[in-house]
Amino acid sequence: MGNLLIEPVSMIVLTGGPCSGKSSSLAHLTEKLSDHGFMVFVIPETATLITNNGIDRRKMYKRKQIVLFEEAIFDMQLAFEETYKRTVTKIFPGKKKVILLDRGIMDVKAFVSRDDFNAILRKRGLNEVGLRDRYNGVIHLVTAADGAIEFYSGENNSARLETPEEALRFDHGIRESWLGHPHFKIIDNRTDFEGKIKRAFAAISQILNIPTFVEKNDRFLVKDVDYKKLPVHQNIQISEIYLRAKDRKEQVRIRKRGQNGSYLYFLTRKKINKENESYIEEEELITEQEFHTLKNLIDPKTTVVEKERICFLWNNQYFELDSYKGTNEGITILEAKHVPTFISIKKNITGDPKYSTRNMARKKTLNDKMLDC
């Protein structure tokens, strides 16, 4: 099986609507990550690359032309990603490496119909879950047309075609294309641009385990949800299994995560420092076979945690609503800074160890069940 925790190179997507500050952010983020000991590699925006070299979308008027254009972006993007990752892994072994991508493969979904995107996947024998979730993180920078309209322009990108209204529409479409990714962060325009970059770096730091201040969400026990008012969303099925650990300061778990019959598998090791209540979390993609082998090492004091996660966007925020199954049936938990109007809360459970995933995995006694009633 090998050392499952050695990640040869991390891939982080920087996406967003037109004029969101992606290109301007890349230089700053590259410098900051380099300061923290990472070798940083940047994959430029494929659409801009081919548009600036003659394949101009402004000359395309038919749906078939647009689909072929997006297919070209899809294939080039995938080739860039695989080539970069394979090459830097071989050339720079043993180094901390991160690839920053100016857009990722799922951005294509925002510019074609659902049927056309599914056809692109079928022709290549690919599935959406595998493509979306293989990145370590996705950072969505909101277009300046949403909250900073005075800064919306095409000066930094000659390939930019969109009006502010179109930019808003594309921005929302791109966000929805990434719904369901396990590490998806939205960076809005509530601060100046310098503050926006700092928040983007903080989000990346959290993904890469770089010590930094992170504004944490509260956790709420949900009383009721008006599902008729739920915005566009993705339903994700998650199974988590805690394994036997050699050290009490360490938690090891495996996770099955996916939808529509397609799944990815992860192994996570969480190292806890009880003195300052901090922790470092390492996560690695594993194969389905490795998952089934490792699940035989389940901690005998625990059971499998099953939940359905609903991922949705509301007021420029990304939400994950977890409804638990099995021994935790009836428990629904929301992590958020601000609670959507269509969700009613039973109580704030921030910091309550009873509702930690580790504790919810514990096998329940008859007394536990009576207390939950």
Language-model-detected regions and their locations in the chain:
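Conserved substrate/cofactor phosphate-moiety recognition/catalytic segment
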Residues: 30-76
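Glycine-rich phosphate-binding loop used to anchor ATP phosphates in small-molecule kinases
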Residues: 71-132
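Hydrophobic positions on the alpha1 helix immediately C-terminal to the Walker A/P-loop
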Residues: 25
